[in-house]
Amino acid sequence: MVGYDPKPDGRNNTKLQVAVAGSVSGLVTRALISPFDVIKIRFQLQHERLSRRDPNAKYHGIFQASRQILQEEGLTAFWKGHIPAQILSIGYGAVQFLSFEMLTELVHRGSVYDAREFSVHFVCGGLAACTATLTVHPVDVLRTRFAAQGEPKVYNTLRHAVGTMYRSEGPQVFYKGLAPTLIAIFPYAGLQFSCYSSLKHLYKWAMPAEGKKNENLQNLLCGSGAGVISKTLTYPLDLFKKRLQVGGFEHARAAFGQVRRYKGLMDCAKQVLQKEGALGFFKGLSPSLLKAALSTGFMFFWYEFFCNVFHCMNRTASQR
């Protein structure tokens, strides 16, 4: 299970093994879902309606956007910003899972609460994600800039992007969108961890004995379900974050349609509601749900997989 397990037969992974499992989980998951992330970001940053009826809309559907990106920018466009994204995923995965395991253990040892309760997993999951976000947010800004730029490219390399952004916008550029990110990530990650735990209990209750044997499938399905639930409930804040992160980068967005400037989180929400309607808060939701199902499913699947591998290694070593 994810989180501290007080049972005597629970996993006995070291802190380093937990961090490595989280890192590898993030690395593999990111490589697999990068195309969905690029499409999602393009949708979120488009001010025109995602509809065929709007003649000014560059993108209006997942398949149409995929074809257009492929035709205009080539296959590698689906992995734009992949290097900063991988750095982000590796660091984020390590810090998030390590923090979560330590926090749930702290709750178990220092309070009367059960470390496996829904509310405990929600709070610990949210705090763990906020810790990871503070650690890797500058890389997230770089990833968004790379994924958002079209052709010709504004940034050619990671080093070029860092230097250009620092000189033209100052050091604060690397923490653009931090407030909505933290506001969004706490409930999102909290729901991921708590829903994953709850869905696993529900799965064990609902499935016949034969279906319980395949633990890897169980982890994948429950992780996917947790991803869909958490993403749907917190999606508007993710959209605000992306809009704010490309502030000052409007010249590179000219080829994608309208360009707007936002003074902050509340101004962004107000402008989206006034000019794009309530549905504007959910632009890019369809690729986001697909991405959330895959990414969260893979995240928990690979994390549990590698933790189990380390657990088996530890048990074998102790028996020698």
Curated annotation (Swiss-Prot):
Catalyzed reaction equations: thiamine phosphate(out) + thiamine diphosphate(in) = thiamine phosphate(in) + thiamine diphosphate(out)
Transmembrane segments: 19-39, 87-107, 122-142, 173-193, 220-240, 293-313
Alphabetical list of PROSITE patterns matching this protein: SOLCAR
Compartments it resides in: Mitochondrion membrane
Alphabetical keyword list: Antiport, Membrane, Mitochondrion, Phosphoprotein, Repeat, Transmembrane, Transmembrane helix, Transport
Chain positions of motif Substrate recognition: 241-246
Solcar repeat copies, ranges: 13-106, 116-202, 214-309
GO molecular function: antiporter activity; thiamine pyrophosphate transmembrane transporter activity
Any Gene Ontology biological process: thiamine pyrophosphate transmembrane transport
Entry-linked Pfam families: Mito_carr (PF00153)
InterPro entries, alphabetized: Mit_carrier, Mitochondrial_sb/sol_carrier, Mt_carrier_dom_sf
The keyword Cell wall biogenesis/degradation is assigned to this record: no
GO CC annotation terms, alphabetical: mitochondrial membrane; mitochondrion
UniProt record similarity statement: Belongs to the mitochondrial carrier (TC 2.A.29) family.
The protein's role, per its UniProt record: Mitochondrial transporter mediating uptake of thiamine diphosphate into mitochondria. It is not clear if the antiporter activity is affected by the membrane potential or by the proton electrochemical gradient.
Name of the protein in its database record: Mitochondrial thiamine pyrophosphate carrier
Lineage: Eukaryota, Metazoa, Chordata, Craniata, Vertebrata
Name of the coding gene: SLC25A19
